[in-house]
Design a protein with these regions (language model features):
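Non-catalytic helical/linker scaffolds that mediate oligomerization, partner binding
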Residues: 1-253
């Protein structure tokens, strides 16, 4: 089997010199992470990469993931025991206020929920639900930057593909992009929703980063072309020392 390297392009690598060097080193697919890319920049980034290399582009969806929104500074410190408002609508966060995406996702939060931000760097314990916001107490102190992955300690409803993902995939299709990745693929139905957009003639990578994804893998496999194991996000639900065993299960499935 020939080894294929998937490389993520970001601010420090999105230039012609770096992309060409990465191409020379054998990169087989360049990933554009939509979680950290503005929709209005997608077309320009694809055009640049296509002008620098013949290696294909892969658009990686935001998917069913909660993230905190913009913070007033590069990072904001939340003091243990401090009261914090979790707003339903998007706001600029500070040491006493924070909001999450997708928009209005906080409406699903309830009293007693724990919301963890940036791999448990900070943990908010929700104490009271109001009409436009929730009150929470900082249970675990720490720094929070903008757009950090977050999770809650119970199942909530999340669309497997966001409106931004849909629009970005459509842009990609018009520009000849043939590789797409679905973050947080939890079921075959999730993958089918992407197939409705990109069709079966294009390549779909399913990212397995949750227990649900592992449990439903046999149903997911017939819908997708490849599997990508996201060990970082998977470690939110699986003890890190057990990740290699889960990887083995996925590989041999």
């Amino acid at each position: 089997m020939k080894l294929k390297i998937l490389a993520t392009l970001g601010p420090s690598s999105l230039d012609s010199k770096t992309v060409r060097k990465m191409t020379e080193q054998g990169v087989g697919l360049f990933r554009i992470n939509l979680s950290h890319t503005k929709l209005e920049d997608v077309k320009d980034i694809i055009l640049k990469v296509q002008s620098w290399t013949d290696v294909p582009v892969c658009l990686d969806s935001e998917g069913a993931q909660i993230r905190n929104q913009d913070m007033i500074n590069e990072s904001v410190y939340f003091q243990k025991g401090a009261s914090v408002k979790i707003h339903h609508k998007s706001i600029i966060g500070d040491e006493n206020n924070i909001s999450f995406s997708p928009d209005n996702i906080a409406q699903q939060f309830q009293d007693g929920d724990k919301v963890r931000v940036d791999f448990n760097s900070v943990c908010f314990f929700i104490t009271e639900k109001k009409s436009d916001y929730l009150m929470a107490v900082v249970e675990q102190a720490g720094y929070v930057g903008s757009n950090k992955a977050s999770d809650i300690d119970r199942d909530i409803v999340l669309d497997p593909i966001t409106l931004k993902d849909r629009e970005a995939f459509k842009i990609g299709l018009t520009m000849g992009v043939k590789n797409f990745s679905l973050s947080f693929t939890n079921s075959a139905e999730d993958a089918k929703k992407v197939r409705e957009i990109i069709g079966y003639e294009n390549n779909l990578i399913s990212k397995i980063e949750s227990i649900k994804g592992v449990q439903n893998l046999e149903d997911i496999l017939p819908i997708v072309d490849q599997i990508l194991i996201d060990r970082g996000d998977l470690s939110r639900e699986v003890d890190i020392e057990k990740i290699p065993f889960v990887q083995r299960i996925i590989i041999y499935c």
